Each structure stands twice: as C-alpha cells, then as structure tokens.
Amino acid sequence: MRVNYIKKGVLLLKIFNMKKIITLFLISLIVSCKSDPVLFELTTSVNPVGYGIVSPNKGTVWLGDQIELSAEANTGYSFVKWSGDLNDSISKVSLIFDSDKSVIAEFTEMTKVPDNIFEKYLIEIGVDDKIDGFVNTNKIKKITSLNISNKGVNDLTGIEDFITLKVLIADNNLISNLDLNFNTELEILSLNNNSLKILDFTNNTNLKIIYLNDNSFENLDLSLISNLIEFSAINNLMNCIKINNSQISSSSNWFKDAQTVFDTSC
C-alpha cells in the first residue's frame, strides 16, 4: 500500500510540475507576443496627380517610430495641405506611427505673374498674399472685373487665367503686349494710353465697349465683334480698321483718327 501511495505522489508531482511548466510557457509566450515589434504601412498619394511629389511616398514603419514627411510642388503648382490620416498645411511634417497611415498631399495650380506691380495689385484685392511671381489660379478664375489703371504696369501676363473676366480697365500704363485669347467673356475693355501695337479679338466676340486711345496700333480687326456698341481709338497709327457689313451703320458713332477709315476689306 505504501508503495502505491508513493507512486501516486510521484505521479501527482509530475502532473503538477507539467502544469507549472505549461503555465510558465504560456506566460512566456504571451509576454513574448506583447513585446514583439509591430509594423505599420505608410501609403501616400498626390491630388491632383502630377502636381507634386511626396517623400517618402510609401514604406513600412515600426510602432512609435517618427518619420519626416515632405511634399514638394512641381513648377507651376503650390502645396495646399495634407489630408487623409494627416491634417496640416505645412509641407514638411513629423508623423508618429501608432497605426497604418494613408496620407494625401493636396496641391493647386499657380498662374505666373512676372510683373511685380500687377501682382501687388492682386494682393491689394485679396487674391494673392506675397510677391513671388505666382498667384493661385483657382482664386483668379472667379474675378469678373479688374481696374488696374495708373499703376505703371508693363506686363499683364497671367491675365489669360482670368477666364470669367468681363471688365478690364488698364488705362495709363506701359503695356506693349497683351494676349486676350482666353478672356472670352470680356464685355468692356479700356486700354487708353499704353504702348500697344497689336490686339487679336478673334475670341473676344462678346465685347460691347472698346477704348484704345493713345496707343501705337497700326491695324485692328473688329469684324467678329457683332455686338460692339462703343469704340474709340484716337491717336494711333492706323489707316484702316476692319469691320463687317452689319457694323457699318454703328461705326458712324465710333471714334478714330481723321486718316483712319472703317472698311470691310482692310
């Protein structure tokens, strides 16, 4: 009987030790799992596509790690903000990882404005914030009227992106070249006392009023502007201004130099 008790005791001891070993193993396994490093994924994108780059643009990052994320705009564009799992308006930011991150770099198109005086005027009317040769294209697309007279402007480059512009008044400046082909909504144009020689009105068929006094025009073609009401181009170098047949009667009330004629076949 005593032997049996001893055997049972040894067996119970073995079972107890085995349970203890298993318990310790499980505890060790849990601790080990908790202490293993955790990896997270970084994914980035650019909106609109092609407007800029993000660095780094993707990667695997350990829990708690911090990376420096940078957004750089391509020429003609500007960084606006981060969106997605990051909300910030600074192009270079630090990002600490506690989960997977999907980040979007938002950019906007910029319009080149090389004339500092013109850009200063855009700052004055609230569509720009600093003189750097560029203005936010989305902001100027909404402008319907500009009066930039008596400023000493040489160059109106950038005006092509004012696509809803209806009124442009730029008298008494130093403008010698001007492209209005993209300003198809123009109705009133006043460019008195500049240095202009040529203007193409092919795409400005909505014009109703044109003032071009005191320039250096050698010819003009108004024949596509069917709704023109007022016109004046005194003190220029023109011999002939082209009009269409429907404008003949109206042209009698328009102003020109004595040597200049309105004709359908200039």
Question: Each PLM stretch: what is its role?
Answer:
Residues 144-148, 168-170, 187-191, 210-212, ...:
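Conserved hydrophobic beta-strand positions in leucine-rich repeat
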Residues 29-32:
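C-terminal motif of bacterial Sec signal peptides marking the signal peptidase cleavage site
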Residues 35-40, 106-167, 224-226, 237-266:
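N-terminal capping/linker segments that flank leucine-rich repeat
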Residues 36-46, 93-109:
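Conserved "repeat-terminator" motif of extracellular CCP/Sushi domains
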Residues 43-60, 88, 119-131:
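Short, solvent-exposed loop/edge segments of extracellular or virion-exposed proteins
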Residues 143, 165, 175, 186, ...:
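Conserved hydrophobic position(s) of the canonical leucine-rich repeat
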Residues 65-93:
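Surface-exposed interfaces of beta-sheet-rich extracellular modules
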